[in-house]
Amino acid sequence: MRLGVLDVGSNTVHLLVVDAHPGARPLPAHSHKVELRLAQLLDEDGAIGPDGVDQLAAVVREALQAAEDKGVEDLLPFATSAVREASNADDVLARVRAETGVELTVLTGAEEARLTFLAARRWFGWSAGRLLVLDIGGGSLEIAYGMDEEPDAAVSLPLGAGRLTAARLPDDPPHPDDVRALRRHVRTEIARTVGEFSRLGAPDHVVATSKTFRQLARITGAARSAEGLYVQRELKRASLEAWVPRLAAMTSTERAELPGVSEGRAHQLLAGALVAEGAMDLFRVESLEICPWALREGVILRRLDHMGQ
């Protein structure tokens, strides 16, 4: 059957259409993505303003039409941290439902981490052993660890690349004092969780998902996206550490000229790099592998599991 997953994230609203059947690998059929940057549309009270809600409803309608055009039988719509943490989240959800008919499911941070872990486990298989999975989104950092398809530990931290950039790096290029302060903040937040994972033992395989990690891997020498999903891509901590000061010295325009870095994400790449560097250092990760699947695929896989029961 043809499934669609509608992901309302902090940076983008992304419709992914796949042909999927229980027991088979989902095959991508269509992708429709609009940059909305919901996290930047919050007012001083933490609410998504009327203009932001109007934009969100319009983009959801557009995605709904795209899903219909592509013959989607079952649409799985969800929202993550930008909506979850908005002070008027209930009103936003009600407006979207009233204007589009779409009922957005708001995932908790822990659910994001668990579903992303499921996607990584299915991609790498049981032979990967104990997995540590890292995912930097626009609003949050998810960390999950486990032997099975359900992680033994899963946390979500407010360390998304977009959130940190908006709150802590106001200048372009950023002021060195702000960069140092952000580095301290990131490492303090991550360090609070390390003990919870350390007691479970060292992972056999460390993987990372989503756009920020893919872009960081690309600028440090990993294969281009055009070379396909099945090319192994790694991010080495030593390479990342060498790039962080270079990114800090660049403007967002200069970062957008780097290989694999989109103009819409260039402004937040430094914050993402500081989070990635901090996580890899504190979890003593020398190298990690990029997983092509992430949260959206996890949502699809969970739906297929329920269909097969």
Curated annotation (Swiss-Prot):
User: PANTHER family annotated for this entry?
Assistant: EXOPOLYPHOSPHATASE (PTHR30005), RETROGRADE REGULATION PROTEIN 2 (PTHR30005:SF0)
Q: Which family does it belong to?
A: Belongs to the GppA/Ppx family.
State the CDD domains in the record. ASKHA_NBD_MtPPX1-like (cd24056)
High-level lineage: Bacteria, Bacillati, Actinomycetota, Actinomycetes, Kitasatosporales
Domain of life (superkingdom)? Bacteria
The record lists the organism as: Streptomyces coelicolor (strain ATCC BAA-471 / A3(2) / M145)
What is the official name of this protein in its record? Uncharacterized protein SCO3348
Q: What terms describe the molecular function in GO for this protein?
A: pyrophosphatase activity
Keywords, comma-separated and alphabetical? Hydrolase
Q: State the InterPro entries in the record.
A: ATPase_NBD, GppA/Ppx_hydrolase, Ppx_GppA_N
